[in-house]
Regions:
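Catalytic histidine-centered segment of alpha/beta-hydrolase-like enzymes
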Residues: 232-245
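Catalytic histidine neighborhood in serine/cysteine hydrolases
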Residues: 218-235
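Conserved hydrolase catalytic core segment
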Residues: 99-138
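Conserved HGGG/HGGXW glycine-rich cap/lid loop of the alpha/beta-hydrolase fold
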Residues: 18, 23-72
């Protein structure tokens, strides 16, 4: 066990020889509420998820791991590929005794959630993809970097020191190589194999995830739907947590959409 952030507590779990840090909510959720696992984006670790974790904690048990190599988790000498990060996420979920959960990813975390739903469907009840990357129409480092620069103008200032600190902690080599792995991941090919209810959430001001790409993601998911949060940037998990929590609660309380062929 470890330090606390108001309403959240730290824990470390050994997975594949690595100590994995996670934050979890300390409130007792309503009986029967599904656990939600928050999967962070590129480099920023679970610290970026704290506002959303606090917003969801009264209704659900929240778990927010730092993927190996990021945040307070142990850093392996090699940079893990997306498939390896996904395997670690699955192993961590089992090690925590979570038989089945809702997985909510942000940005590159969405790519891991999609991989998990395809490779380990027994663990996944529903998925929420908030700002899913990488748009195949802009799958180069130059294009994505320009989109990230544009997005930084719309993000709340409190995210900047968190992001810079976490980027420094994970190191430039790990950050750039993970970025490269994400660029090489054809998420669009995996989406039709996600066989659980799926919610895609986009901020209307998000230049990283265009409206066209968000619609394509939802259309490719057999049980997918799209919600757009007005004037929201890319990182809704940090900058619009109350609005995002509201649409997540609505999604989880609604009956599953009928599966369609895609």
């Amino acid at each position: 066990m470890g330090r606390r952030t108001a309403g959240l507590k730290s824990t470390w779990t050994e997975v594949g020889g690595l100590r994995v840090h996670a934050r979890f909510s300390t409130q007792t959720p309503p009986e029967g509420a599904s656990p939600i696992i928050l999967v962070h984006g590129l480099g920023v670790a679970s610290r970026s998820m704290v506002p959303l974790a606090k917003a969801l904690a009264p209704s659900y048990r929240i778990h927010a791991p730092d993927l190996p190599g990021f945040g307070d988790s142990e850093k392996p000498p090699q940079v893990l590929a997306l498939a390896e990060l996904t395997a670690c996420l699955a192993a961590w979920t089992r090690a925590c005794g979570l038989e089945r959960a809702v997985f909510l990813g942000n940005s590159v975390g969405c790519q891991l959630v999609v991989r998990l739903a395809v490779r380990h469907p027994e663990l996944v009840e529903r998925v929420v993809l908030q700002g899913p990357t990488m748009d195949p129409g802009a799958r180069t480092m130059r294009q994505q970097t320009w989109r990230w620069i544009r997005n930084s103008r719309g993000e709340r200032g409190s995210l900047t020191p968190i992001a810079l600190r976490e980027y420094w902690r994970c190191g430039l080599r790990r950050l750039l190589k993970t970025f490269r792995y994400a660029l090489e991941d054809p998420i669009e090919e995996k989406l039709p194999r996600v066989r659980v209810p799926a919610l895609v959430v986009r901020g209307s001001w998000d230049p990283i995830v265009t409206q066209r790409w968000a619609e394509e993601v939802a259309d490719r998911l057999p049980m997918g739907r799209l919600v757009v949060i007005r004037d929201g940037p890319h990182t809704l998990i940090h900058n619009r947590p109350l609005d995002l929590a509201r649409v997540v609660r609505e999604f989880l309380s609604a009956a599953p959409a009928k599966r369609r062929d895609v």
